[in-house]
């Protein structure tokens, strides 16, 4: 057996061919983490192909020095190649994120349970390959994730690890087996009902995934700032296409990219918690004599059942002139229009 290896070397995005010793053959698979000799140095790397058709003769190949552990799946290798090309980066950075933090030589038992698909609009959306879930501002992630997880193994990506821990605990309480990334990488690779974590978990290993969910897909923390600068949304779409999983984006304020991708596959959740109303008040509408606040703001503030937030111009920014004593706004003596003070102190 011979393999193609991508070395874990900064600045190098080239693959090299190696022979596999007979003792290592049972352990080697696409994505396996190995150690090889390169330019008289011992370096780590990932197996990207087995028995490639254009390999040179085995007699001219150096042997792999060591099998280090189980690494990203073959599907992750393919997805990483596509994303790296799309965002003008190197695969090494992605495969490092997709690899376990500690070496894994063997996987635990598969802990997946049977799936019980339910009805409703989410079931229809799942059968169509997923879509956009337009939720309320404070939508509880657990409720929606439970509904989606009943269709099969689920990968959920949330903006913050704190949120991931909370949801993981609640999903375990609901009877699902859960892998919290990155600590439970080995269990995720073996098989669980729910895999959940922050941005990097979008590269988590999956066994026969049914759904991939990106929660709060509009959140900027789901953008990778290091090269390649991928977005979790793009990776989820790519991996869903490669695995046949349904892809869901959940957000109270969906991004234009998510709306365009959904193409009408939109489900509005039953959460009634929506954004509060925003009003822009023209201070001149109250007439020539006004105070620092409009009459509409004062009326709303008197209602003790409401919480009102007022955003006003900071001192020194407003260019209108108001009398300090009578609060009259300076107006043109001919047409009664409001006047502003220019930089040379003229009206």
What kind of feature is each model-predicted range?
Residues 1-291, 299-316, 326:
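Accessory, non-ATPase domains that flank or precede helicase/AAA+ motor cores in DNA-metabolism machines
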Residues 313-347:
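Conserved helicase/translocase motor-coupling segment
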């Amino acid at each position: 057996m011979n393999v193609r290896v991508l070395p874990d070397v900064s600045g190098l995005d080239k693959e090299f061919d190696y022979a596999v010793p007979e003792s290592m053959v049972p352990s080697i698979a696409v994505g396996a983490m190995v150690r090889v000799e390169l330019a008289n140095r011992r370096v780590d790397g990932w197996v990207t192909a087995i028995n490639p058709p254009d390999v040179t003769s085995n007699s001219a190949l150096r042997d792999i020095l060591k099998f280090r552990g189980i690494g990203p799946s073959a599907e992750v290798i393919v997805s990483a190649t596509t994303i790296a090309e799309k965002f003008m980066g190197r695969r090494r950075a992605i495969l490092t994120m997709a690899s376990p933090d500690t070496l894994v030589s063997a996987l635990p038992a598969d802990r997946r349970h049977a799936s019980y698909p339910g009805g409703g609009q989410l079931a229809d959306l799942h059968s169509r390959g997923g879509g956009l879930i337009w939720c309320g501002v404070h939508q509880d992630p657990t409720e929606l994730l439970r509904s989606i997880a009943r269709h099969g193994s689920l990968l959920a990506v949330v903006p913050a690890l704190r949120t991931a821990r909370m949801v993981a605990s609640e999903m375990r309480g609901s009877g699902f087996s859960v892998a919290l990334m990155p600590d439970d990488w080995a269990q995720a690779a073996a098989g669980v009902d729910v895999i959940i974590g922050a941005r990097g978990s979008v590269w988590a290993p999956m066994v026969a995934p049914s759904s991939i969910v990106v929660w709060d897909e509009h959140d900027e923390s789901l953008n990778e700032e290091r090269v390649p600068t991928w977005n979790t949304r793009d990776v989820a779409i790519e991996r869903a296409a490669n695995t046949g999983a349904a892809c869901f984006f959940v957000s109270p304020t969906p991004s234009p990219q998510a709306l365009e991708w959904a193409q009408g596959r939109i489900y509005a959740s039953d959460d009634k918690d929506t954004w509060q109303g925003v009003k822009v008040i023209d201070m001149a509408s109250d007439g020539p004599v006004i105070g620092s606040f409009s009459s509409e703001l004062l009326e709303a503030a008197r209602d003790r059942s409401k919480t009102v937030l007022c955003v006003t111009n900071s001192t020194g920014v407003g260019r209108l002139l108001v009398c300090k004593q009578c609060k009259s706004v300076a107006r043109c003596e001919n047409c009664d229009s409001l006047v502003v003070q220019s930089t040379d102190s003229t009206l």
